[in-house]
């Protein structure tokens, strides 16, 4: 089951029904322990239990919202994956962040109220517990933005980072060798079509590079992935890759094997292999996987349409959830139903290099989103 995260309440809020005397009487043993030891003990408890733990006392409420606890979780290697989704609604409405969480109820998708609405077409990457959100625009025919923010997913707080050198919307981005590369999202211009962000020095640098001739003039892309140390970019009529170490580009046209099934955002990379949703079942299965070394697509065995809810490719998104495959989406949002489903699929290799999938869970995670919502992207963060 995709058990993700629960964000506790504001530690500054006082419970009017609390009895301060009772709380003091319950704390002597706890207060005798070193704070570092307390944090190490609580760090071993899954985050989904933190809301219940916060009811014990003010001290616990403070602890589970402290940076020390998350440092302890990281040091102990007890971080957990959390799935985030950027969901937009009607045209010209800025999308908002949602995340999946579980407490004592079934898995549910919840809006993060502490984060402001994002720009549509923003490029997003994750590093540990942080999400970097770059560029975007309010809507079609609106100016692009060069703004960059970083979101701390432990506390759902955010701050601005230095702007990119160019304003970009629907750019491609990926992390290679610990640095964030951003490509396109603006009209082709060799001098600064590619930028790189150093997360240590918090600075942007232009990467001189010749634009691939096949890329569209506006530089707006459908989706992007990182595979084998290269940033693969899906354009409107072609796809291409960029290898930053040597600055090499490679292109594939619409008739290539790579673009046979890679034609929408319902795709992601797991274990350096590209997975895509193909509800036409051209290979007799709804999920296919691309082997870049062999330049061939194969079906993911063990998963059939009977195992999945009713989905459409343009309303569904794939994500790498800590080595598992997650499908977040639903059917035609123009119909009366606006349900969003979450499907978790474990992946394993059998019989040489054949990928098999095992459906671990299928659940409705939202029933009340507005009609015609669009899941722009999904990202997994470790917290």
UniProtKB/Swiss-Prot annotation:
The keyword Amino-acid biosynthesis does not apply. Residues 11-21 have a biased composition (Acidic residues). The keyword Repeat applies. SUPFAM superfamilies: F-box domain (SSF81383), Kelch motif (SSF117281). CDD domains: F-box_AtAFR-like (cd22152). It comes from the Eukaryota. Keywords: Kelch repeat, Repeat. Kelch repeats lie at residues 130-178, 179-224, 226-272, 274-317, 324-370. SMART domains: FBOX, Kelch. Residues 1-21 are annotated as: Disordered. InterPro entries: F-box-like_dom_sf, F-box/kelch-repeat_ARATH, F-box_dom, Kelch-typ_b-propeller, Kelch_1. Residues 27-73 form the F-box domain. This is F-box/kelch-repeat protein At2g29830. The lineage of its organism: Eukaryota, Viridiplantae, Streptophyta, Embryophyta, Tracheophyta.
